[in-house]
Amino acid sequence: MDFLLLGLCLHWLLRRPSGVVLCLLGACFQMLPAAPSGCPGQCRCEGRLLYCEALNLTEAPHNLSGLLGLSLRYNSLSELRAGQFTGLMQLTWLYLDHNHICSVQGDAFQKLRRVKELTLSSNQITELANTTFRPMPNLRSVDLSYNKLQALAPDLFHGLRKLTTLHMRANAIQFVPVRIFQDCRSLKFLDIGYNQLKSLARNSFAGLFKLTELHLEHNDLIKVNFAHFPRLISLNSLCLRRNKVAIVVSSLDWVWNLEKMDLSGNEIEYMEPHVFETVPYLQSLQLDSNRLTYIEPRILNSWKSLTSITLAGNLWDCGRNVCALASWLSNFQGRYDANLQCASPEYAQGEDVLDAVYAFHLCEDGAEPTSGHLLSAAVTNRSDLAPPESSATTLVDGGEGLHDSTLEPITVAIPGGEHAENAVQIHKVVTGTMALIFSFLIVVLVLYVSWKCFPASLRQLRQCFVTQRRKQKQKQTMHQMAAMSAQEYYVDYKPNHIEGALVIINEYGSCTCHQQPARECEV
């Protein structure tokens, strides 16, 4: 069939005048893409791709046509003038990153209709006109990161219906205009991290029905309202790390398919009880390094699909309010950080939350403590072991049919609580005994080493001990003899009135004295 059509065309052309044939051939040649001009000096050409990188160029090369790709990165371009790339109508990608560009005129990209990828990152651009990207309706990827943009023109991205990736990281953007992305219906990735955003308008992200990943980390946001992300039905990941967020609220009751949320490194003190009910498919949540003191039971009940959570670095108050969190963690089968420490009260500061619940009997109600089960469940979770068949029944378990009124006070019924306490007591006794034996063995070892290494010193020390003991015995003997002599003076002495010899007895012997009869003097 193709050969038949070709033959008919040739037959028709041969029957026409030669002038008509020449005109038709000229028109065909004009429709063919032009071949690229000669490769500029010091540049690298690969077919219809031109790489003029790190050549300290201050202007783009001239007389270029027929190129499909042009890279001018790592040069010294300072300005993009109007019509600078008009001869590159076949161009599909243009790299201008890592230059010194500070000015981009509104019609600098005229006649670049086929460009799909544009990179302007790592320059010094402070503003872009509304018409900057109008000549390039087929753009798929735009990179404006690491510039000095302070504001975005309201219609900067107007008409970019095929745009899928937009990078604006590390600028100085302070505000996102309302409906600025209204025409970006195909956008899937948006990065506005590391800017100076202080607030978000409710319709700033309107129209992004296909957006799957949104980065807003390292800004100055002080409040997060899920109503600022309306109808982002395809959003899968939301990063709000390292802002100044103090509260998290949701003023719209609607459900979205978010699976990953990062709120770490903020200043969160309060979260509305129903805030996570709008994200029932959430699997990964980062809440570490905030100022949370406790978590509402209603929030815990809404974390049914979580498989990973980080809660460390908060100001946990290990009072009665921590019981709901402790019970939820004891039943949680996913991954969570093990270093949850109490910040208050003083007697529990620095203690692990679950250990404090057990040690200080924080969640006891009547005679049945909750601590034994919480500790055993925590150990089970941390060692990735399967939970026991007869697990405890708690009021905060993420199950069905629970209301807020049933969560105060929180109690835990534990059939084997006494066995757990007995096991802990036995463990303490065994630990103490082993410590005592270990101490005794250390003392014996020290004596043995001393005896082997310093025998003369030990012999002298033993002789000193023996000499001192002998002296002590002699002193005791002298004291005993003195005591016996004193008893003889007071017990055996019998005075008599017989005139004659007096016998004096002391410890050195006896002495006899003769007493002369007294004579009375006459007066």
From Swiss-Prot:
Sequence ranges on the Cytoplasmic membrane side: 450-523
Residues of this chain annotated as glycosylated in UniProt: 56, 63, 130, 381
Subcellular location: Cell membrane; Postsynaptic cell membrane
InterPro entries given in the database record: Leu-rich_rpt, Leu-rich_rpt_typical-subtyp, LRFN, LRR_dom_sf
Residues exposed to the Extracellular side: 35-428
Keyword Nucleus: no
Stretch forming the signal peptide: 1-34
The keyword Phosphoprotein is annotated on this UniProt entry: no
Short motif (May be involved in DLG4-binding): ranges: 520-523
Record keywords, A-Z: Cell membrane, Glycoprotein, Leucine-rich repeat, Membrane, Postsynaptic cell membrane, Repeat, Signal, Synapse, Transmembrane, Transmembrane helix
PROSITE patterns to which the protein is assigned, alphabetical: LRR (PS51450)
Gene Ontology cellular component terms for the protein in this record: axon; endoplasmic reticulum; excitatory synapse; extracellular matrix; extracellular space; GABA-ergic synapse; glutamatergic synapse; growth cone
Function according to Swiss-Prot or TrEMBL: Exhibits strong synaptogenic activity, restricted to excitatory presynaptic differentiation, acting at both pre- and postsynaptic level.
PANTHER family: KEKKON 5, ISOFORM A (PTHR45842:SF12), SYNAPTIC ADHESION-LIKE MOLECULE SALM (PTHR45842)
This protein's name: Leucine-rich repeat transmembrane neuronal protein 1
Gene: Lrrtm1
